[in-house]
Design a protein with these regions (language model features):
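Active-site microenvironment for binding and transforming phosphate-containing groups
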Residues: 1-171
Length: 171
């Protein structure tokens, strides 16, 4: 239900719902891929289990010490969803080049210089725009992270964020 509504009315859904992107069933590569999103609603949060699958939705990865990305060729179908794993200090950057949008998960917000010919920067969200370093030090039992969800609708990209805490298990 959340995913269907998100595709048709992204602005409203992104501002009112919470999402969690679970990448454990995804074959990870430095390049992004198309994915299938399987959704479950649990305790008011839409959990998305994503897996490799030919579809109109995309995933772009975190790559340690670099910037993982996915390219999406235009024209783009309305309702296309683009996701990445959680961010807790990284930057989200979107560039446009040769009729393609490129979504980057810039590790630690400092690795875009390793990418060549990225095109025109359309959007960049630095960690300081979504992250307060005081949050990270509040607990040794939870790791905070931000989940970004991007949806294409009527010629525009709509970007939303949902904050969650991961539980850290100690022996």
């Amino acid at each position: 239900m959340g995913l269907t509504q998100l595709r048709t009315n992204p602005q409203t859904v992104l501002s009112s719902e919470h999402f969690f992107v679970d990448t454990r069933n995804l074959v990870q590569t430095p390049l992004g891929c198309t994915v299938q999103i399987n959704e479950q609603l649990k305790n008011g949060v839409f959990y998305w289990d994503i897996a490799n699958h030919h579809s109109t939705d995309f995933y772009f990865p975190y790559v340690q010490g670099n910037a993982g990305y996915v390219g999406i060729q235009t024209p783009i179908q309305d309702g296309t969803v683009v996701v990445t794993g959680g961010m807790n200090g990284c930057a989200l950057e979107v560039c446009y080049l040769n009729d393609n949008y490129y979504f980057y998960h810039d590790a630690n917000g400092s690795n875009m210089h390793k990418q060549r010919n990225v095109g025109t920067q359309v959007c960049r969200i630095e960690a300081g725009n979504y992250w307060n370093n005081n949050i990270a030090g509040q607990s040794t039992f939870y790791i905070p992270t931000i989940q970004f969800v991007c949806v294409y609708k009527a010629g525009f990209w709509h970007v939303g964020a949902s904050g969650i805490y991961y539980t850290v298990l100690k022996k």
